[in-house]
From Swiss-Prot:
Family label: Belongs to the PPR family. PCMP-E subfamily.
Keyword field: Repeat
InterPro entries found in the cross-reference section: E_motif, Pentatricopeptide_rpt, PPR_At4g14850-like_plant, TPR-like_helical_dom_sf
Listed GO MF terms: RNA binding
PPR repeat residue numbers: 65-96, 97-131, 133-167, 168-198, 199-233, 234-264, 269-299, 300-334, 335-369, 370-400
Annotated stretches, region: Type E motif: 405-477
Protein name: Pentatricopeptide repeat-containing protein At4g14170
Species of origin: Arabidopsis thaliana
Gene coding for it: PCMP-E17
GO terms of biological process kind: RNA modification
Domain of life: Eukaryota
Length: 477
């Protein structure tokens, strides 16, 4: 039988094995445990050759060999035939053990079908006599992390305890990482503290989890504990440490971490470069951020967006727009953060038409505006004194405006003394946040500025009766 050349797909030993297999098949030679089949399946032959192997297994009844059949499932998955081919092979296996279940559950999890992976696990638990081992549970916990299915994660946790896997380092580590990924840091910390042995992966996960949730101080405490335990620091830890420094505005510490990275790393990778740039942006040291950005060997949308947002929030309209245009010229598509940067720049510059241009451009990139994008546009219109238009913009929003969006319009009303719009927006905000004194104070100020002193005094009296008071400011003098 003539087969197309596969020199680009196979090493010489594998090609020889397949030639031997074809010759043996032609002579109807069969064994119960042919090593060539294991080797061919392991090396993931192309789809055509794999179908030959599949047919041979069926014809010679070697399909009943659970290891061979499981390897066949894995081989199809490696060729991106996970669904439906791998799954079909799996369900047609005459016998399935934990090895075969682990393969199908793991492959669905690794291929991005987390929910399907969870469904398979639950089916194994309910419909078969097979019970999970300490390889199955980390696989399924990883799937729960990816799918953010908290209910499934809690259920698997209960099963882990019920089956006696609480002492397994593999399972406990997977549980900690799952809860970190879901943002349930109290659960993760309790498990972490109860573990007799902890490795650098766990410390890094906890540290990163705290920083991702904005708990920079708790993250730094975990970092110190990690250092006291003698674990080596790597680039993953440094990324989280830089994020913590950025959140706290700890420029001095951020510079120290930057120096450590330069001394230890011959070339800053993309993630480290992005983290250093973002740290300087959050500390409002944009010259340093730009220098790091320019010297990066590779930049992605995160690199560009971080700097564009920094200049936008700083009010540097020219630089924000310039970087946006350069990014598009390099063929990098903007994301939601990129547009937030240029919209913030528009708001600072009072560029209403430009803000509408960028806001509409989001649709061309299939980016659904978030509330913060609406807030930036509303802020831009309000700063320009277009308060009736801004109010209409709020009314036409496809989602209910939040405090930031309405607050931007109310601030504009305060600047321009627009009592009519300000009164309507303030009442919406008071309904949303009835205990927030600043909205009452702003509305009372609008009444007073318009000469409506009785209404202003009535509102202040009502605040006293409801015990709504503004938190007094502090002075260091």
């Amino acid at each position: 039988m003539h087969l197309p050349s596969s020199s680009s797909l196979y090493s010489s030993p594998t090609k020889s094995l397949f030639a031997m297999f074809l010759k043996a098949r032609a002579l109807s030679v069969t064994t119960q445990n042919p090593p060539d089949l294991f080797s061919l399946l392991h090396h993931s032959p192309n789809a055509k050759h794999l179908r030959h192997l599949h047919a041979h297994l069926l014809r010679t009844f070697l399909y009943s060999n659970v290891v061979l059949s499981s390897k066949l499932v894995l081989a199809y998955s490696k060729l991106n035939h996970l669904f439906p081919t791998s799954l079909s092979v799996f369900w047609h296996m005459p016998y399935r053990n934990i090895f075969s279940w682990n393969i199908i559950i793991g492959e669905f999890s690794r291929s991005g079908f987390a929910s399907k992976s969870i469904d398979l696990f639950l089916r194994m638990w309910r419909e078969s006599c097979v019970r999970p081992d300490d390889f199955t549970l980390p696989l399924i916990l990883r799937a729960c992390s990816a799918s953010r299915e908290a209910k499934s994660g809690d259920l698997i946790h209960v099963l882990c305890l019920k089956l006696g896997f609480s002492s397994s380092l593999f399972v406990s580590s997977a549980l900690v990482i799952m809860y970190v990924d879901m943002g349930k840091l109290l659960h993760a910390r309790k498990l972490f503290d109860d573990m007799p042995v902890r490795d650098s992966v766990l410390y890094t996960a906890m540290f990163g989890g705290y920083v991702q949730q904005g708990e920079a101080m708790l993250g730094l405490a975990m970092f110190r504990e990690m250092g006291y335990s003698g674990f080596a620091l790597d680039s993953v830890v440094m990324v989280s440490l830089l994020m913590a420094c950025g959140q706290l505005g700890a420029l001095k510490h951020g510079k120290s971490v930057h120096g450590w990275c330069i001394r230890r790393c011959s070339c800053l990778g993309l993630n480290l470069g992005n983290a250093i740039t973002d740290m300087y942006v959050k500390c409002s040291i944009l010259d340093y951020a730009h220098t790091v950005f320019v010297n990066m060997s590779r930049r992605d949308v995160i690199s560009w967006s971080s700097l564009i947002l920094g200049y936008g929030l700083d009010g540097d309209v020219v630089m924000s727009f310039k970087l946006f245009d350069e990014m598009l010229k390099e063929g990098i598509e903007p994301n939601a953060v990129t547009f937030l940067g240029v919209l913030s720049a528009c708001a600072h510059g009072g560029l209403v038409e430009k803000s509408w241009l960028y806001f509409r451009l989001m649709q061309e990139y299939n980016i659904v505006p978030e509330l913060k994008h609406y807030a930036s546009v509303a802020d831009c219109m309000s700063r320009a004194g277009l308060l009736e238009e801004a109010e209409k913009f709020l009314e036409d929003m496809p989602v209910k405006p939040d405090e930031a969006v309405m607050g931007a319009v109310l601030s504009g009303c305060k600047v321009y003394g627009n009592v009519e719009v300000g009164e309507r927006v303030a009442r919406e905000l008071i309904q949303l946040k009835p205990r927030k004194a600043s909205y009452y104070v702003t509305l009372a100020g609008l009444y007073s500025a318009a000469g409506r002193f009785d209404e202003a005094e009535s509102l202040r009296q009502w605040m006293k009766e409801k015990q709504i008071s503004k938190v007094p400011g502090c002075s260091s003098i």
